[in-house]
Amino acid sequence: MNVTIFNVATGKVESLVSGREEDINAMLDGGQDCIEGHFYPKDFYINAGEPVAKQAQPTPNHIFNYVTKQWEDPRTLQELKDAQWASIKRSRSQAEYAGFMWDGSTFDSDAVSQNRITGAVTLAQLSSAFTIDWTLATNQVRTLNQSEMLQVGAALGVHVQTQFAKGQSLRVQIDAATTQAEVEAIVW
């Protein structure tokens, strides 16, 4: 016999057991009962002796409340704000490293590419005769002169600063939020 043992007061599934009926009944304490079949605690609770499927867990942080029969996020407002800010920073980095456009060409902007652009800008500042064949994000090659290389460097700077300015604006909104819903509404 396969059964699910549950807490009668809350409906929380406490264990799944297989065995003889008399052995299973001997395992039950005063606040427990069982129903036939295996209903996994991650997916079910018991209501009036019947298994009820839980809704999908919204996030790994949510905990099922057996009184309200709903998923709840137990984090404090500050913990929610900290988590949202961490998410915003990840999105900001992704946007920063996703590349940028200048004069119809897409340039890489990951950390290594930013260093390469900075180095090329430094070289361009040393000679008005500067030229370089630059491999674009599309793997096409574009020849840049001194003026163009300096403009690419400036465009990179604007691109990075734009991402950080957006992040700073979102941080102000996160700090000002007073409810979980307000915090969750702030996205990249």
Where are these regions (language model features)?
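A preference for well-ordered globular domain cores
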Residues: 2-30, 48-188
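Metal-dependent nucleotide-binding catalytic modules
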Residues: 29, 34-42, 46-47
